[in-house]
C-alpha cells in the first residue's frame, strides 16, 4: 500500500515539472508571456499558449464569425487589472473568452472580430518607464506575428477605428462582465445600445467552449491529474497537521510544484461543522480529533481548470455515523456518474441524485420530510467545467450532454449543528466531487485516480510513512522550540 501511495503522488508528467537544464544563451524576444522560444520546456513550435496551436485559435475565431449575424461584430475585452490597494494588484487572470479567441494572456487589450475585417486587435502601448517597472508586454507586433491578428493597432487608435466599425454594423456583441470603458463610453456604442443593437456575446462563445478539442482535453486531463496528486499528498499529511490553514497551503504548494499556475479557486478546507458551510473559505481552524475534513479544490493549468472534492478523517478512521452518511454520498456519486452519457442533461442527473439522497436521508431519520431536503443541499449535482470553474454559464442545465463536454458530479449533504435531526448527525458536511468527460459511448472520470472508497482512504492514511518533519505535529514543534502551545502554530511555517 505504501508503494501505491508513492506511485499515486509521483505520477508527474513532463509538463508538470519545469526543467532546470532548459536554457539558451541566444537572445529571446520578450512579449510578456511564454513563447516557444522563451519557454521551450513548456511549449512546442507553433503553439500560442502551452498545448494550443495557432491553427486552433484561428479555427475558434472562424466558428464564432459563422455564429454572428450578417454585418455584425464582436468586441472582446481583456480582463481588467484589479487592485488590492492603490499600488498592489491582485494576481491577474485573463478573461476566458479573450484568451479562448486570441491566446493573449495579458491585460490592456481589446479584440474585435467580424466577417469583413477578421480579427482586429488593439494592443497596449508601453513607455520605457512602464517596461522598467512591469516588464515587456505584447504590443502591435506580437498581435500580428504571434496571435495572427488580421489587423493590429495601438490602443490609442481604438476610439477612431472602432467607432467607425460600430457605425457600419447591424449588431454589436460584447461581454458585459469584462466590458471596458474604452469602448462602452464611445458615442457610437451608446447609440447602438439605445437602439437595441448591442447583444451579449457569451451566448455565442459559451456554446463554442462547451465541446472541448483534443488539445483542450489533454490539458484538462493534466489539470485533473495535478489536482488528484496534490489532494492525495495533502490528505496523507493531514494526520500530522490537522489544521485547515496548513492543509490549504499544502494543497496549493503540491499543485504548483507540479506545474499549475494557480488554484482554480480559494480551496474550501472545512473541518468538523465548518464542512456544513458549502463554500466555507476562512480555513483558519484546527481540526478536532475524530472530525472529518472536507476539501474542495482545483487547479489551473495553462487556462484549464479542475474541480475536485474529497472528505476524510485525518485521524485515519471513519466513525460508524460518518461512515453511514459517507456511504450514501459515495453511492450517489457513483450512480450519477454511471448515468453520464450523451443525451442526458445535468438537470436530469440532479433530479436523480435528489431522489437517491432523499431516500437515504429519510431512512437514516435525518429528514422528516422530503420538503426539507434543500435545507441540507441547495446545490446542483454539478456544472460545466473548462476554462472557468463554472464554465459556459450562459448555457442552461437542460442542454443534452454531448461528447466533449466536461461536467462535475458532486453530491453532498451539509447538516447544520442546529438542524432538527438525531444529534449524532448534526454538524456533519460531506461532499464527493469528480470531473467527468462525456464520450461517444459514455464517460471518462478525469479524477478517477483520487481515492474515495472508505477502506482505501483509511488504509492510505494509516500506512503512510511520514518523514521526520511530517511526523512532528505543530503543537509538539511549539514545545520543542520552548513556545507556548496556545500560540498559533502556523507562525512557525
Curated annotation (Swiss-Prot):
Q: Which InterPro entries does the UniProt entry name for this protein?
A: Aminopep_P_N (IPR007865), Creatin/AminoP/Spt16_N (IPR029149), Creatinase/aminopeptidase-like (IPR036005), Pept_M24 (IPR000994), Pept_M24_MAP (IPR001714), X-Pro_dipept-like (IPR052433)
Reported phenotype of the disruption mutant = No visible phenotype. Altered mitochondrial protein stability.
Q: How is the cofactor bound?
A: Binds 2 manganese ions per subunit.
UniProt keyword terms in alphabetical order: Aminopeptidase, Hydrolase, Manganese, Metal-binding, Metalloprotease, Mitochondrion, Nucleus, Protease, Transit peptide
Q: Where is the transit peptide?
A: 1-19
Q: Give the UniProt family note.
A: Belongs to the peptidase M24B family.
What is the name listed in the Swiss-Prot or TrEMBL entry for this protein? Intermediate cleaving peptidase 55, mitochondrial
Amino acid at each position: 500500500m505504501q508503494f501505491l501511495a508513492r506511485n499515486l503522488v509521483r505520477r508527474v508528467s513532463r509538463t508538470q515539472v519545469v526543467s532546470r537544464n532548459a536554457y539558451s544563451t541566444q537572445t529571446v524576444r520578450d512579449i510578456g508571456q511564454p513563447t516557444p522560444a522563451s519557454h521551450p520546456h513548456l511549449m512546442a513550435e507553433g503553439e500560442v499558449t502551452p498545448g494550443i496551436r495557432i491553427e486552433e485559435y484561428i479555427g475558434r475565431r472562424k466558428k464564432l464569425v459563422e455564429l454572428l449575424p450578417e454585418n455584425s461584430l464582436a468586441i472582446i475585452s481583456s480582463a481588467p487589472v484589479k487592485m488590492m490597494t492603490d499600488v498592489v494588484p491582485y494576481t491577474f487572470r485573463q478573461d476566458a473568452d479573450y484568451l479562448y479567441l486570441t491566446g493573449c494572456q495579458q491585460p490592456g487589450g481589446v479584440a474585435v472580430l467580424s466577417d469583413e475585417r477578421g480579427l482586429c486587435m488593439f494592443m497596449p502601448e508601453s513607455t520605457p518607464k512602464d517596461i522598467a517597472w512591469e516588464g515587456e508586454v505584447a504590443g502591435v507586433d506580437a498581435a500580428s506575428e504571434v496571435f495572427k491578428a488580421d489587423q493590429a493597432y495601438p490602443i490609442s487608435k481604438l476610439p477612431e477605428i472602432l467607432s467607425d466599425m460600430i457605425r457600419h454594423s447591424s449588431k454589436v456583441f460584447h461581454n458585459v462582465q469584462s466590458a471596458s470603458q474604452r469602448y462602452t463610453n464611445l458615442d457610437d456604442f451608446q447609440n447602438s445600445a439605445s437602439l437595441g443593437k448591442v447583444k451579449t456575446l457569451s451566448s455565442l462563445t459559451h456554446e463554442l467552449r462547451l465541446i472541448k478539442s483534443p488539445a483542450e482535453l489533454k490539458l484538462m486531463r493534466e489539470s485533473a491529474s495535478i489536482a488528484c496528486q496534490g489532494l492525495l499528498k495533502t490528505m496523507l499529511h493531514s494526520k500530522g497537521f490537522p489544521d485547515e490553514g496548513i492543509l490549504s497551503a499544502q494543497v496549493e504548494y503540491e499543485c504548483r510544484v507540479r506545474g499549475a499556475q494557480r488554484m482554480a479557486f480559494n480551496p474550501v478546507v472545512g473541518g468538523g461543522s465548518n464542512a456544513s458551510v458549502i463554500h466555507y473559505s476562512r480555513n483558519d481552524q484546527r481540526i478536532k480529533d475524530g472530525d472529518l475534513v472536507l476539501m474542495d479544490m482545483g487547479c489551473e493549468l495553462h487556462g484549464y481548470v479542475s474541480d475536485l472534492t474529497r472528505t476524510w478523517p485525518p485521524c485515519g478512521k471513519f466513525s460508524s455515523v460518518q461512515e453511514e452518511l459517507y456511504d450514501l454520498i459515495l453511492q450517489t456519486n457513483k450512480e450519477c456518474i454511471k448515468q453520464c452519457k450523451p443525451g442526458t442533461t445535468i438537470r436530469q442527473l440532479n433530479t436523480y441524485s435528489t431522489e437517491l439522497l432523499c431516500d437515504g436521508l429519510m431512512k437514516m431519520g435525518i429528514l422528516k420530510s422530503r420538503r426539507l431536503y434543500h435545507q441540507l443541499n441547495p446545490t446542483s449535482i454539478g456544472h460545466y467545467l473548462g476554462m472557468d470553474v463554472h464554465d459556459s454559464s450562459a448555457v442552461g442545465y437542460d442542454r443534452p450532454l454531448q461528447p466533449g463536454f466536461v461536467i462535475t458530479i458532486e453530491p453532498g449533504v451539509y447538516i447544520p449543528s442546529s438542524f432538527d435531526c438525531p444529534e449524532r448527525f448534526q454538524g456533519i458536511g460531506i461532499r464527493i466531487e469528480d470531473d467527468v468527460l462525456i464520450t461517444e459511448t459514455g464517460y471518462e472520470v478525469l479524477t478517477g485516480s483520487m481515492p474515495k472508497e472508505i477502506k482505501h482512504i483509511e488504509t492510505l492514511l494509516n500506512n503512510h510513512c511520514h518523514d521526520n518533519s511530517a511526523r512532528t505535529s505543530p503543537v509538539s514543534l511549539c514545545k520543542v522550540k520552548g513556545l507556548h502551545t496556545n500560540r498559533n502554530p502556523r507562525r512557525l511555517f
